[in-house]
């Protein structure tokens, strides 16, 4: 008869005990890291229900620092950035006047929207050989006919409007109920003929003071206005008396179709003004944001409008700007509030743009709205 060695059983039991202790210790350390590393989750859970914190409270200073300490987007996981941003929403937002003025002063030196946002008779005299933004070898000679289309001077001046809303087209706007807050702004910018029909007004509002039109939309949807003139005119009437803004001098392909927009509105005796981005303004804005890490073939129209708004408005609010497939709560959203058509890959650097907006929000320079609004 063979007998089991009792010491062997004790060794096996001891090994299992050590393994169990190791697993428990590892789990405990991991749990403590989750609780203590970077943020105190339990404390924040209860703080959330205490109501919004004042902008300059110690807690909010810490939360803003957690956004600002991320110098480049690749430093943190997307979920980590979302969590930090979501935590910051418990803080009231207020404009940091000194930070905002300093930033606007920088924009004034590099870009100067009040003087160069649009081509005007003042900044682009008759006979000017205007260089395109992209086709730098291309030159457009400003003749009498084109010169008459330009306003005599910029229609807007520095800090003219108290509160502006720049409305992007992101799916983050869907079910936001931000329409009333957008409509309450003194001046509203919109991008690329977005739908503002009754189906969407609760979320996106209707007020529009400037709406941009990408010439590719005119080419694809309205056959370059060679035949489809009235349908295009009807689309613009949705925005009532909003000014129409186009990048006529971005490249040579854009010019004729952009100028045709002016002819169409004149033919239908529309009161809507037509303006064209000054190509040098677009070049300067692109260079400025490149210096802040936005590397793209072309910056988005939204970023251009935000840059201009920061000079033309005292206070700037952003709606519909979000470049991720999930909202800050981790729920999947459509790319636009009206469809899920993705952009051409590699053309814009939208995540980098949004990342910069979150920094500007944290510095009190502008406000980014990504949640549900409770206006007025």
Swiss-Prot record:
Lumenal topological domain residue ranges: 39-376
An MF annotation (GO) of this entry: sialyltransferase activity
InterPro entries recorded: Glyco_trans_29, Glycosyltr_29_Sialyltrsf, GT29-like_sf, Sialyl_trans
Known pathway: Protein modification; protein glycosylation
Gene Ontology biological process: carbohydrate metabolic process; glycosphingolipid biosynthetic process; N-glycan processing; oligosaccharide metabolic process; protein glycosylation
Disulphide bond pairs: 164-313, 178-373
Protein topology in the membrane: Single-pass type II membrane protein
One term under GO cellular component: Golgi membrane
Residue numbers annotated as active site: 348
EC number: 2.4.99.-
Record Gene3D superfamilies: Glycosyl transferase family 29
Pfam families per UniProt: Glyco_transf_29
Binding site for substrate: 192, 214-216, 300-302
Residues carrying covalently attached carbohydrate according to the record: 56, 96, 241, 284
EC class (word): transferase
Keyword list, A-Z: Disulfide bond, Glycoprotein, Glycosyltransferase, Golgi apparatus, Lipid metabolism, Membrane, Signal-anchor, Transferase, Transmembrane, Transmembrane helix
Topology feature Cytoplasmic, residues: 1-17
Chief location category: Golgi
Keyword Glycosyltransferase: yes
Subcellular location: Golgi apparatus membrane
The reaction(s) this protein catalyses: a ganglioside GQ1c (d18:1(4E)) + CMP-N-acetyl-beta-neuraminate = a ganglioside GP1c (d18:1(4E)) + CMP + H(+)
Superkingdom, taxonomy of origin: Eukaryota
Family as reported in the entry's similarity comment: Belongs to the glycosyltransferase 29 family.
Family annotation (PANTHER family): ALPHA-2,8-SIALYLTRANSFERASE (PTHR11987), ALPHA-2,8-SIALYLTRANSFERASE 8E (PTHR11987:SF4)
Stated role: Involved in the synthesis of gangliosides GD1c, GT1a, GQ1b, GP1c and GT3 from GD1a, GT1b, GM1b and GD3 respectively.
Protein name: Alpha-2,8-sialyltransferase 8E
